């Protein structure tokens, strides 16, 4: 069944999930988790009430009682499960997925996550089977339970004096709206009412278009920091006072100032395999040990508990805490980051200065290759580098991670899509670009074979008219609505129907700049120039991309080429090159 994922159940409501499936999930869940009473919370999505009714009807038809805590953040369900000793719980949410999706996050006793390998596989088999459902004679009851007061009292012990901070908060019209005002206090709030239609932006804090409003608010109000929550408040990202996105893994290092520096907690710090080496280097001041593990809550929460680690985090913006029953909480992470920043501000430090102190590295960000032969490509990358030099550290439990003295890389497969995900970090921008180029060259062979198979039949059906339709669609998405990811997909289709459409490559490159995918943008813009060598705007935007990568020398080179080919109004840009 399509909705059963590695970490949870999630999919489009009405197709991947519906009331009948939700009922059967509730009915068969007691076969996976033995409990007399199930704790259930839900988010504010349009379909969540319907899903709650169907799920709980399935549970009560099996004779199980339900304690409903009503509208809840996902971390509130985790906390309540462990705090009150429930043996099983369900949160109805699709987290950061689009508005027409919904899902279920299932936990066992102590808020231990139930993933595909630890129960969802068996549940899927039962739900998909022909096994009939039959209400029992002694049906269970649904009771309302109010846990808000206890939860807020727990959270408030981590809140510091924030009176010297100017804070911006974007709740994404999601569940953090329930508690943000009370825990954060005075701030500039946007999108802080519950709305399952997500009218302002998608509730995914890693998406560039979701970050636009909070970045603008930070700059407009001259804030010290911006907070951007996801839909169910288990993830958060931060924006510095300059309006720049902070890579979430670097916050793992900063949290150490509180847990290890101030509270003197003992125990390992957990990071995922994509996380920066800067975390360990920063935490060396506390003689802390950082353990690297697999991506995903189903793995991280269990590993942190196994290690009795004090806290941990992921590149995706999840932060886990021993004090939070080894589970993740965006609001708790926010409280601690704000508390630390308030103290640092008294000493004259800004958020950007703190991050610069944490990391000396240039980072590629995650680069995706569309490819079927993922394992072969990964092996080829591994073999290329290990044959040149033995790495200082080699990890192979979530793809491969190779660590060398001045750089490292991770290459890992997507579990659900034909993508190979690559990320690297180096102490110099030149080394970073060299690594990216090398890996692209290795993977290109495997990717091209896959693309060649996909394009059989397309080669003989090039259609410039269809290409123009997708071009216009992408341009509207990008220029009118600011939906850069969707625009990129439209330009992909435009290129499929006309591989010589230089404008499509150019516009896709511009979309990628807005998504902060600068290196990929440069590749598209260079392709546009290959097809149209005098394309002044393409030269100019390559210059922009290099400038945003802090390579001013290359930026100036392309600004001058743009000027040479007749792009007007470049005086301010060229002045920087004097």
Identify the meaning behind each predicted range.
Residues 38-102, 183, 187-239:
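N-terminal small/polar loop signature for handling phosphorylated ligands or for N-terminal nucleophile
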Residues 1-57, 61-63, 142-164:
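An N-terminal, well-structured beta->alpha segment
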Residues 265-423, 429-448:
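Phosphate-binding and adjacent anionic-ligand microenvironments
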Residues 507, 541, 573-575:
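Canonical tetratricopeptide repeat
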Residues 466-468, 502-503, 536-537, 569-571:
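Helix-start (N-cap) detector for alpha-helical repeat units in TPR-like alpha-solenoids
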Residues 102-221:
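Gly/Ser/Thr-enriched, mixed-charge loops and adjacent short helices
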């Amino acid at each position: 069944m399509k909705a059963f994922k590695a970490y949870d159940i999630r999919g489009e409501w009405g197709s991947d999930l519906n009331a009948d499936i939700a009922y059967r999930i509730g009915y068969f869940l007691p076969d996976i988790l033995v409990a007399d009473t199930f704790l259930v919370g839900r988010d504010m999505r349009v379909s969540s009430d319907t899903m709650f009714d169907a799920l709980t009807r399935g549970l009560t038809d099996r004779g199980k009682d339900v304690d409903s805590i009503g509208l809840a953040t996902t971390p509130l369900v985790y906390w309540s499960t462990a705090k009150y000793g429930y043996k099983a719980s369900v949160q109805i949410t699709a987290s950061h997925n689009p508005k027409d999706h919904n899902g279920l996050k299932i936990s066992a006793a102590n808020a231990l996550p139930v993933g595909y390998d630890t129960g969802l596989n068996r549940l899927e088999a039962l739900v998909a089977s022909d096994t009939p459902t039959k209400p029992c004679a002694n049906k269970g009851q649904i009771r309302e339970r109010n846990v808000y007061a206890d939860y807020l009292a727990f959270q408030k012990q981590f809140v510091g004096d924030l009176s010297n901070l100017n804070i911006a908060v974007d709740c994404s019209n999601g569940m953090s709206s329930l508690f943000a005002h009370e825990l954060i206090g005075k701030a500039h709030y946007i999108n802080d009412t519950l709305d399952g239609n997500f009218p302002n932006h998608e509730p995914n804090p890693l998406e560039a278009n979701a970050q636009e409003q909070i970045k603008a608010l930070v700059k407009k109000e001259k804030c010290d920091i911006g907070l951007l929550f996801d839909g169910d408040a288990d993830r958060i990202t931060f924006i510095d006072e300059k309006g720049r996105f902070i890579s979430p893994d670097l916050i793992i290092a900063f949290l150490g100032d509180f847990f290890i520096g101030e509270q003197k907690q003992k125990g390992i710090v957990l990071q995922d395999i994509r996380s920066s080496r800067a975390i360990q280097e920063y935490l060396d001041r506390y003689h802390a040990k950082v353990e690297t593990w697999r991506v995903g809550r189903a793995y991280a929460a269990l590993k942190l508990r196994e290690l009795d680690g004090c806290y941990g985090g992921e590149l995706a913006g999840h932060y886990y805490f021993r004090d939070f029953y080894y589970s993740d909480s965006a609001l708790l992470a926010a409280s601690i980051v704000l508390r630390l920043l308030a103290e640092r501000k008294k000493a004259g430090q800004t958020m950007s200065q703190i991050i610069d102190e944490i990391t000396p590295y240039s980072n590629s960000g995650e680069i995706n290759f569309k490819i079927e032969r993922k394992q072969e490509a990964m092996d080829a990358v591994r073999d290329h580098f290990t044959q040149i030099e033995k790495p200082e550290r080699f990890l192979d439990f979530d793809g491969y991670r190779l660590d060398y003295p001045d750089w490292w890389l991770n290459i890992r497969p997507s579990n659900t899509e034909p993508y190979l995900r690559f990320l690297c970090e180096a102490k110099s921008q030149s080394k970073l670009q060299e690594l990216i180029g090398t890996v692209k060259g290795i993977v290109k062979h495997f990717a091209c074979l896959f693309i060649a198979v996909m394009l059989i039949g397309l080669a003989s059906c090039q259609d410039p008219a269809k290409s123009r339709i997708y071009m216009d669609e992408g341009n509207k998405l990008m220029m009118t609505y600011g939906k850069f990811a969707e625009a990129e997909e439209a330009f992909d289709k435009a290129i499929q129907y006309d591989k010589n459409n230089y404008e499509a490559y150019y516009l896709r490159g511009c979309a990628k700049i807005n998504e902060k995918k600068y290196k990929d943008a440069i590749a598209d813009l260079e392709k546009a120039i290959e097809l149209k060598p005098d394309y002044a705007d393409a030269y100019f935007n390559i210059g922009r991309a290099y400038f945003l990568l802090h390579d001013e020398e290359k930026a100036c080179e392309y600004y001058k080429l743009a000027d040479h080919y007749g792009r007007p109004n470049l005086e301010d840009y060229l002045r920087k090159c004097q």
